[in-house]
């Protein structure tokens, strides 16, 4: 009887932990664009956005963001299954001929980094397009 009760309690705690939304929190987003000789990395965390560029126009700027801005980014990410981001297909392939910058979107969630495959900057897969646009819109205030 004690064993059955103990097993029941363990199962209930396990089930509750798996459904806890806080256990699956997003820590940061990164959007990187690159080509031969230059890269730009946009990193968004709950309290700031950082833009770092290398190459001829190298710069590094950080701007604080508020909770409303962070929540707007989280809202755009809410429809994305981050565990399947690496399976998303790029709608175009202009980066192969240097007609567009390469771009990669990364999401850090529970100390795991999920990334898309490379896609054309300015034309992300439709599943992540609202999130990419929100990050770039927020970054306009940094550069």
Outline where the language-model segments fall.
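N-terminal export/targeting and maturation segments
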Residues: 18-54, 60, 64
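A short-motif feature that recognizes glycine-rich, charge-decorated loops
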Residues: 51-85
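A short, sequence-level motif marking secondary-structure junctions
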Residues: 45-48, 66-68, 118-124
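Generic detection of short hydrophobic beta-strand segments and adjacent strand-loop junctions
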Residues: 42, 62-65, 80, 112-117
């Amino acid at each position: 009887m004690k064993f059955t009760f103990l097993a029941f309690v363990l199962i209930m705690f396990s089930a509750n932990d798996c459904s806890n939304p806080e256990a699956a929190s997003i820590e940061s987003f990164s959007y990187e664009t690159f080509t031969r000789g230059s890269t730009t990395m946009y990193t968004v965390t709950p309290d700031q956005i950082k833009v770092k560029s290398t190459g001829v126009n190298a710069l590094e700027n950080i701007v604080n963001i508020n909770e409303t801005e962070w929540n707007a980014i989280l809202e755009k990410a809410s429809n994305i299954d981050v565990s399947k981001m690496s399976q998303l297909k790029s709608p175009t392939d202009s980066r192969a001929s240097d007609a567009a910058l390469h771009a990669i979107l990364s999401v850090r969630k529970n100390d795991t980094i999920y990334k898309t495959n490379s896609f054309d900057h300015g034309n992300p897969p439709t599943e992540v397009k609202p999130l990419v646009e929100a990050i770039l819109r927020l970054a306009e205030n940094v550069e």
